[in-house]
Amino acid sequence: MLNLAKELVGDEALGLLKYLIGKKSEITDEEIAKELNTKPNEVRKYLYLLSDHGLVTYRKTKDKDSNLYIYYWKVNVNQINEILLSRKRLILEKLRNRYEQEKDGLFYFCPQDNIKYSFDDAIENEFKCLKCGTSLSQYDSEKARSFLEQKIKQIEEEINKEIRRESSKSY
């Protein structure tokens, strides 16, 4: 699941997420910055990114002395697996759609520029590359289909494994 989180938020934010996973209670952005020896603005930027993806949540209170808001952050433990699982399902759906396109479509490519064209686009351009004018060759989508089949199977297995793990936790 952390690999998917990395794809969503990048290495820097993933490091912060791992740090927060290790925390047992809420922590302020200022405390995080101090502990990680990072600028508070940098920490906030990544916290907001993680929050946008639902991976962390925050609670906001107003400081009585300074009248400023203090944000307390924590990992969204209740939702993190569900969020990442739904992202995997979305990726799986896109891969299946792409597989169907590769399976059902006829494609051409420019051997010079490696640009792929649909059959309709190839006809419209008289089977010439728009970029360099080279004649297009028919594209064998077998490698792409094979790769997509592999990825689809891998993600289906990951999803099923997560579902089994979650259902075993509830008993």
Swiss-Prot record:
Pfam families: TFIIE_alpha. Transcription factor that plays a role in the activation of archaeal genes transcribed by RNA polymerase. Facilitates transcription initiation by enhancing TATA-box recognition by TATA-box-binding protein (Tbp), and transcription factor B (Tfb) and RNA polymerase recruitment. Not absolutely required for transcription in vitro, but particularly important in cases where Tbp or Tfb function is not optimal. It dynamically alters the nucleic acid-binding properties of RNA polymerases by stabilizing the initiation complex and destabilizing elongation complexes. This is Transcription factor E. InterPro entries: TF_E_archaea (IPR016481), TFE (IPR039997), TFIIE/TFIIEa_HTH (IPR017919), TFIIE_asu (IPR002853), TFIIEa/SarR/Rpc3_HTH_dom (IPR024550), WH-like_DNA-bd_sf (IPR036388), WH_DNA-bd_sf (IPR036390). The gene is tfe. It comes from Sulfolobus acidocaldarius (strain ATCC 33909 / DSM 639 / JCM 8929 / NBRC 15157 / NCIMB 11770). The keyword Transmembrane helix does not apply. Monomer. Interaction with RNA polymerase subunits RpoF and RpoE is necessary for Tfe stimulatory transcription activity. Able to interact with Tbp and RNA polymerase in the absence of DNA promoter. Interacts both with the preinitiation and elongation complexes. Residues 1-81 form the HTH TFE/IIEalpha-type domain.
